[in-house]
């Protein structure tokens, strides 16, 4: 138990050190299961790669399975058998070879069950506010007297993670340059919305969004997706 607790703490601290959030770790016979959320690296793949590298640097025993969260909803499960982790730690294979040989699936049910009694999340993202800036470039060629109509905007947004799957977004559009007139030259609201993600069993995902969308559209949007295990 002491060794397992030490390994859990080491994995958790390694993930904290690279900025991961919503971290949980649990030991079951022969398997270390870890869940985390990447809100640091803009590329999901970069974030996952950093997390794998951090976990491989920890002294886990047995197989290693990582659950990748998005807005605290499980999205992917990455499986690294003990033969693979030991080969990497012994210098027999490279990190690239680990990526090539590890298993990836959308089916996270078993892994999340293993984390059921893992306790509170470390570095929770709930009620955390992020300030994002999105560049926006619009080009259109539909007139004979001008080569292009264009608009360049900066769209700062405040994004707040709420409860599990819940998110609030408030965005403003700041025009930088344009040859259009009217509203396109004015500061105006962008996306102001509240969304809720849900994961059902058997890889079915749902998302409901209500609020103000682009182009002055108000309303609600419902998405349902199914993903195969691969």
Please annotate each region the language model reported:
Residues 1, 152-162, 187-200, 218-230:
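Feature captures outer-membrane beta-barrel proteins of Gram-negative bacteria and organelles
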Residues 1, 33-38, 131-143, 168-176, ...:
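Transmembrane beta-strand segments that form the barrel wall of outer-membrane beta-barrel proteins
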Residues 12-35:
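Short edge beta-strands and adjacent turn/loop segments
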Residues 42-44, 142-150, 164, 175-188, ...:
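Solvent-exposed loop/turn segments connecting transmembrane beta-strands
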Residues 43-63:
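Short, non-transmembrane amphipathic alpha-helical segments
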Residues 56-84:
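A short amphipathic beta-strand at an alpha->beta junction
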Residues 93-129:
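Outer-membrane beta-barrel biogenesis signature
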Residues 122-180:
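Core alpha-helical transmembrane segments of integral membrane proteins
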């Amino acid at each position: 138990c002491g060794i397992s607790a030490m390994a859990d703490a080491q994995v958790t601290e390694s993930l904290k050190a690279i900025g991961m959030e919503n971290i949980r770790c649990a030991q079951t016979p022969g398997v270390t299961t870890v869940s985390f959320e990447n809100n640091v690296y803009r590329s999901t793949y970069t974030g996952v790669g950093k997390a794998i590298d951090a976990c491989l640097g920890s002294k886990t025993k047995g197989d290693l399975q990582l659950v990748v969260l998005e807005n605290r909803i499980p999205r992917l499960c990455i499986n690294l058998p003990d033969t693979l982790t030991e080969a990497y730690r012994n210098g027999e294979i490279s990190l690239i070879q680990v990526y090539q040989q590890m298993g990836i699936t959308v089916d996270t049910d078993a892994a999340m069950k293993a984390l059921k009694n893992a306790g509170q999340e470390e570095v929770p993202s709930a009620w955390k506010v992020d300030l994002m800036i999105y560049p926006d470039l619009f080009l259109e060629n539909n007139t004979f007297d001008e080569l292009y109509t264009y608009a360049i905007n900066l769209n700062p947004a405040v994004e707040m993670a709420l409860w599990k799957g819940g998110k609030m977004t408030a965005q403003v559009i700041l025009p930088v340059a344009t040859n259009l007139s009217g509203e396109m030259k004015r500061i105006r609201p962008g996306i102001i919305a509240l969304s809720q993600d849900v994961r059902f069993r058997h890889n079915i995902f749902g998302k409901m969004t209500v609020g103000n969308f682009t182009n002055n559209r108000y309303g609600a949007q419902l998405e349902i997706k199914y993903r195969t295990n691969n």
